[in-house]
Amino acid sequence: MAADVPGSPLAKNATTEEALAWYKSQYEELEQELKEFQQSSKELEAELEKDLDAADKRERALQQKAEGLSYEVEEWKRKYKESKSEANAAQSALEKEITALRETNRTLQLKLRDIEVANDDFERQARNTSSSLEDLESKYNVAIERAVMMEEEIKIGEQERERLRVEAQRLREELSDLKIEAEILQSKLRKHQARGHLTQITTTIAPAPASPLSTASSPLVSTPPDTKSLSTIDTLSEVQDPPSPPMSDASLGKGLRASRSTPVKQTASRPGGCRTPKTSISKSAAAKSSAQATHKANQSFSENNITPKPKPLSSSTSSQSNRPSNGRFNTNSYPMVRTPSSRPSGARAAERPRAPVHRIPPSNSLTHIRTLTAQMQKLEARVHSARSKLPATAQTPPKQSPRFSGGIGGLAATVAMRGKKQRGVGASTSSLNLLDDDNASDISGTHSNPDFRSSTLNLSKHIPRLSTSGVSRIAFGPLPIRHPASAAASTTSTSTATATNVDSEVSRPSSRASSSGYGRPISRADSHSTAASGYMPSSSSRPISRTSLPGHGTRTPVGSWPRSSGNLSAYGHGPAHSQASISYSTAEEDELTDDGQRELRSKTTPARRRTGTLSARDAPDHHHTGIPIPGSGGNRRQSGSSSASRSSVTGSLSLRRQSNAAALGHGHGHNAGYGHGHGTVPGGTTVRKVVDLGETY
């Protein structure tokens, strides 16, 4: 504005009018500017008011909005706090739950581990149980099979036992018939000789002293006893009365028995069975008796298809020399061993005192007998060599019985010797009836051989007896051996008999005389026999098993060794004499080789009494049989100790049957085994009365 204003009027050449006029013009301009300024100020004020109102409105709205937002903020804060607290609570709860779950998981893991361990144990136990069950099942099956096999074997044994019993009964009946026939023949021979053929009896010769090595007679030919007066016979009948030949003679066939019938009748016809000097008789009588014997021998040989081969007579001479001249036996000598080497030589026999020069003319039957004697010697040697090759069993030998303390061949220390005239009663183990004196005298009156007569009585009065208990009595091992008499021969001659009788033993009752098993006392008869004979148990033998026999593949159960019924027992009579007793039971009879073997046992040849009669089970290898075997005495002659020799003679016998016959063939005499008493018949003959002690199971 200062620029628009004209120069100041106060300029030196400006007049008052100009100055006025300038002032006036300035004023008007200023006023105009004021009005415009006022107007513009009003407009601006109005606009500012409007703006202020609008700002107020906006402020109020914003304030309301801020208040609402603050409220919302508060709400959200509250909600946030609530949700946060809830989240914290949930988090803490979840954390606690997680902790519990972790603990639970750990516990479950431990339990699972224990369960797995237990499961492993259970699985192991299950495997063990299954394997044990399989083993048990296999063992059970094996046991069942074994039981079935044993039942079959027992059935077979029962059948064999029944067959043997029937066979033994049949053989016993035939033996009784043959004894009756022999009795008739002997009576006829005595009547024939009583007519004057034996009237030239010369003076007797004193018997020579007994030899310690010659204690057995010939197995087939028993020489007559030495001659003594009838008074001496009556007083010393136990010395002079000869028993029958050893039962091993029964191992021959019918032909051998028939051929021996003549010596039986000749010797039995002499008074008292005593040896008489050989006298000269008429040739016609000798021819007649020899013709009868030859006819019977030839007939028997034709039945058995046996052709006798003539041999020199030296064999019978040497065999006869084995008999002691005085009829006694030395019990202190070596126990008799039935081996061919035990026979005395012929030179020793030649040194013996002989009978008077008067002799009976030789007969064909005697020649046959001597020939058969030589054949038997050869067969015995062959059988011994054959049996030595048989396999032996693995069975331990039986233990020695503590009942006897005496040495071999000597008497027991606790046994008192009896006098020569004391006559013991042979204890028969079978259930026979006692025979009174009248019956014994009546029956024995028809016999001059008391041994033969007593055997006939005892067998004729035999009553078969079976076990009524209904339960089989089984032996649990080999029976102890009472006598060592046949220790050397029994291992070869009777080893096969063991296997044969095994089947029959399972259900066989034991007898008192053969009781040497467990829990059974020894019988009185066997104790006396052992004491009198001086035997002692032996444990040097082994029984043979059935597997070693041909045709028998099955093995017999261990411990079932049979006890047989035929048992020998004896009482002591003097230093070396005993009387034998034998019994037979139907259910316990061992099998003979054939039908004719009992004929040989029935037709006994009188010979000297042999000492120490044994039960067959008393021998080392005879646990299984009751057939008698040789007694004491050293180097006694063999008497058919091999069962194979009978097989060679008869031709078709099996080894099993031979073993039973071998057991039968080891006795002292055929009729050794019957109780004897005293008695006399007309003619001064000493008669033994049969007495039986009976048997109790």
Swiss-Prot record:
One family name in Pfam for this protein: NUDE_C
Subcellular location per the Swiss-Prot or TrEMBL entry: Cytoplasm, Cytoskeleton
A cellular component annotation (GO) from this entry: kinesin complex
Entry's Gene Ontology BP terms: centrosome localization; chromosome segregation; establishment of chromosome localization; establishment of mitotic spindle orientation; microtubule nucleation; vesicle transport along microtubule
Low complexity composition-biased segments: 204-225, 278-297, 312-326, 486-500, 507-516, 529-548, 635-665
Listed Polar residues bias regions: 226-238, 259-269, 327-344
Keyword Cytoplasm listed: yes
Coiled coil: 11-195
Region entry Disordered, spans: 204-364, 388-409, 486-686
DNA-binding as UniProt keyword: no
GO MF term (any one): microtubule binding
Keywords: Coiled coil, Cytoplasm, Cytoskeleton, Microtubule, Transport
Predominant place of localization: cytoplasm
Bias type Gly residues, positions: 670-682
Function field: Required for nuclear migration within hyphae during vegetative growth.
Family: Belongs to the nudE family.
Record's subunit section: Self-associates. Interacts with nudF (nmp-1 or nmp-2).
Protein name: Nuclear distribution protein nudE homolog 1
